[in-house]
Amino acid sequence: MGKITAIKKLKRLYRVDLSGFDDEDKIYLSEDTIVHFFLNVDKELDDADLEEIQSYDQFAQGKSLALYYISFKMRTSSEVRKYLSEHEIDNTDQIDEVINILTKNNLINDKAYAENFIEGKISMGSAGPYQIKQKLITKGIDPLIIDQALSNIYDEEKQIDVAYKLAEKTNRTYGQRLTLKQLKDKIIQNLMNKGFTYSISSIALESLELETDEENETQLLYTALEKVAKRYSKNYEGYERKQKVTQALARKGFSYDDISSALRDYTFPE
């Protein structure tokens, strides 16, 4: 049997001095633990008492750390779990208990987190459902919770609206720098990279009602022709050079008819 000989408050914890224990002469406990066990100077403790106190204290400190961590912004249960593990709360059962208590008190709510995250992305107009899902998965949220939240919040109409605005932005950026075909391909690719399906991306693209700017297309073709011709003239000539240039321009999205027309009037560099 041992006892407490002194209790001193430190910056964050209390130092509890002990006597009568072979392996412990002092321990550091949270205020929650001090209050929970009514600890005071001269209180007698046996080995079982000490083990129970230390076990509870790790839980109490874990809860305190978790409350501190979530005080700045919403966190997922997975983020809280990782944070506790990184801060020397190594008992998984106690971490589970902390998570369960905070969840029961609605201080951790993965469903609400997913819903707020999705609504934020929709408001920002920055991502499609697939990209949102992948980001939430990295935060440790159950895919079933994510799918349900997306289904409830991010319907097809909202997806088309966000995709259309992103398509408009791409058009403003690249409209005069690309051919119509290149521009359409660019818009579709950008939208799919943002997490929209091909179907939604195509609807957004069609809604733009893009039209060919003949003057701009011609200028782009001749600019590209100059660059490609200069490159291939270093190693090729005659028919082979013409074929290489034609293929290169076709890969850039120019039609064979337009390429042939341009080449008829073009003089290759010597």
From Swiss-Prot:
- Note whether Transferase occurs among the keywords: no
Q: Tell me which GO cellular component terms the UniProt record holds.
A: cytoplasm
Q: Which domain of life is it from?
A: Bacteria
Subcellular localization: Cytoplasm
Q: Which cysteines are joined by disulfide bonds?
A: none
Gene3D superfamilies from the entry?
Winged helix-like DNA-binding domain superfamily/Winged helix DNA-binding domain
Task: Spell out the Pfam families in the cross-references.
Answer: RecX_HTH1 (PF21982), RecX_HTH2 (PF02631), RecX_HTH3 (PF21981)
Give the record's keywords alphabetically.
Cytoplasm
A Gene Ontology biological process in which this protein takes part is:
regulation of DNA repair
Q: According to its UniProt record, which protein family does this protein belong to? A: Belongs to the RecX family.
The role this protein plays is:
Modulates RecA activity.
List the protein's name. Answer: Regulatory protein RecX
User: Could you tell me which species this protein originates from?
Assistant: Lactococcus lactis subsp. lactis (strain IL1403) (Streptococcus lactis)
Originating gene: recX
